Amino acid sequence: DGIDPDCCRNVVIANCIVSTGDDAIVVKSTGPMSRRYGVCENITITNCVLHSRDSALKIGTETHGTIRNVTLSDCIIDRCSRAVGIWVRDGGTVEDIHIHHLTGSTLRYADRYAEPGAPGWWGKGEPIFISATPRKNSRTKTGTIRNVTFDNLSITCESCAFLAGEPESCLRDIRIRDLHMTFKRQGTQPGGLFDEQPSVRHVYSHAIPALYARSVKQLTVQDSTVRYADKSEAWASEVTTLEDCTESAVDLKKIQ
């Protein structure tokens, strides 16, 4: 990783170029640090260039305590596996997260499992990824994600905006405005996969819409578009797929 605020308060990361193999910036709440220092809050990230073979900004997956009041703004996402990824896995709450004015690209990188110790990258080129799903073999309550906003994002991508909870841990109050996605093949890897690592669902085949939402309450998408610069069998014909979503209003248009 590049920079990892773990159970920190009142942090400003500004005017940085972060280039990493793993995640560029990770905001998290590990078990020992959560017990010692408590809430992770008031984290501002602005005016940065972020390059990673995983997420540009990752919140989680270690979420033993509360993470709140995190902003990411005015940044360039430079060829990352994901632009923004938010996970809960360990019973904590992630809330009041605000992302705005990002531009750049996301793509799927090749995994190298054949080489001992080589990484398997998380992410398949998603501009937005939010996940509240249990870890494999975990008996811990998953946790809560609520009050997350995205505003003014322009991303060339290889996969969808992915929002996924479970019936017992639904995402709440997710608002997206002025998200503009251009689907374009940039790497060499095939698509058609959803990647929910680390979780009981793991990685599995699925046609890729522009927006996928599962178990979300109060989802709002406004003034957003998707354009397909390339053709791929992995990309679904429908723009949106909603499963078990309530109180949702989605305005996402396909443009030429």
Question: How should these model regions be labeled?
Answer:
Residues 1-256:
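Extracellular/periplasmic carbohydrate-active domains that bind, remodel
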